[in-house]
Amino acid sequence: MLVSSKSIAWLGAALIALAVVAAYSTGLRTPFQYDDLSTVVENDSIKHLSDLHLVLSPPPNVTPTSGRPVLNLSFAIDYALTGLNASGYHATNVALHLVAALLLFGIVRWTVRLPAVGLESPADFIAIATAAIWAVHPIQIGAVTYISGRSDVLMAVCYFAVLAAAIRALPFDAAQGRGSPHVSAWTVVALVACAIGMAVKESMVTAPVAVVLYDRAYVYDRFATALRERWRLYAALAATWAVVAVLLIDAPHSASAGFSAGISPWTYLLNQVLVIPEYIRLIVWPDDLLFAFGEARLLTLADVGAIGLVAPLLVVAAIWLWHRRPALGFPAVWVFLTLAPTSSIVPIATEAGAARRMYLPLAGIVVLFVVGIYRITQRRPRRRASSARPLSLAVAAVLIIVLAATTAAQNREFASPEGLWRASLERWPSRLAHRNLAAVLLQEGRRSEALEHLRAAADQGPLSRYALGVALFDDGRVGEAIVELQRAIDESPNEPTVALEGRRVLARALAQQQRHREAADVFAQVAALTPGDMAPRLSRADELRAAGDLPGAHEEYQRILAAQPDHSGAQTNDGLTLLRLGRVSEALPLLRSVAGREPRNTAAFMNLASAAAAAGRVDEAVGAVCHILADDPRNRSAQEFLADLRRAAAAARVRVADCPAR
């Protein structure tokens, strides 16, 4: 009995869904990992879905979502539905991954039927095998199981949607040679998907180029013809580049990516020619989980060696294949086109490489592999040709099962933070792995082990040295912490975390060592980096006061109060500073203000009592102390202060009223 192509398509979609669930269900209980903390747990902008302006304006310090409003919105929806239950976020990632796989299935199924390919008969097999292998390959774990990897998954959904809609928007059915009645609608779908994708991740910028190359490879015999027939679509898609431009202006990534990221394009390129062969190894033989490659290293040509020829030769081979046979060349060019935004000469200082960057590029490799397997089996001797289709199916089925089982197993490894970073350290040693393993060990109270890893990474970058400094500070080794933190700041004064958080910890460390003037200077630097935050200004003023610079402290407190007149900390400490300066009449209003706003603040009323007593306002001082005792009759400090007041009053022959009866 013949089965219709439509029925096979539905069956194929079901098989792909089954494979995805089998491969990734083991990762649903994985806790928040690595950047997930800043992306979700500490990201306040996703916790108020009703405030769309806040949701669509993620803070610049949340690296995975900065300048990516649609990505941030997806996390906000998850938070509204599941709170901080990591399983809900994982389920969304898996669902989006399945959507991407089904879109890839449709794209391949349509494409192999085109005259330029001429594989009408095995189209369903090739499409199902391609989408399933792509979906369950272990290298995809970094994008699917890693919650913050959603940027790659959601962007890929948009990328595939653009290509699928562009195919459906052809002014004629390329396979059947007849007109399409829905050109305008599919054009709009392609345009909307492209614009949304640009607001998910910047790597979407190559999507318009991919559409042009696809048309040339499979539909038109010349670029000129494609441009003449579809220039409006190409122009509309290219116009969405403005979305990326606006978002990058609003939330630049200059500290972590781009030509001002602290890594030269040449150095970054040398890192890529080492990383890309490792990607290939993980694709061909995914025997282990390699999550991250760490920050870019300072390399020379001598460090790269002969392996540095692999990536350039593959690029040349892809271009050669494109010129010889565009239909086969497109998947090869696709690999480098989709990889280029993260793996060429534009530096990403925080990551030299990551397996999740192969999320989209893998599709091109799998297409070439599946078509290659089919072609090889078709070239068997004529008398055995009848077994070619079953053999192709068997090879694909076995591969899908093995890959899905491997992915399921590696997902379990991913679920352990310590196991994840130990595995990364064993397979690709980096300061990132040392640093994150140390963070896990610190959480478990294994401080000596953690410090060993931080010391191993300290000489490899300022972030690692900063982490070592923080760990030493938390361990009470303040002098050592100051040395490491100062070195980290000197080595990389513009690195965001080091520049801000490093200075915060350094200032606290200096204060603990009674180096108050130095601490005040560092707090001033923190205040300059966070102009709207009064906390470092208050700390600076407090350190000036501790250093004996009372006039300087008073001036700093006044600056805070000019910006926030009811700032209790500034009012309290300025009032105490004025008392030490003998300016009691100026101190009293400040201390009264704090006590009036905070009736249960014992310290505020004690300060007011002291100031009132110094001003000779005994009744007011007694009233403040009585207020404390009314709430806490056993407060020893208040009792002693009241007794002192009474003795002083008796000596001066001044009558002091009793506290009101409770």
Region locations from a protein language model:
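Polytopic membrane enzymes that build or remodel cell-surface glycoconjugates and lipids
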Residues: M1-D474, A535, N573
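C-terminal luminal/periplasmic domains and tails of membrane-associated envelope-modifying transferases
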Residues: L2-V3, R382-S387, E418-R662
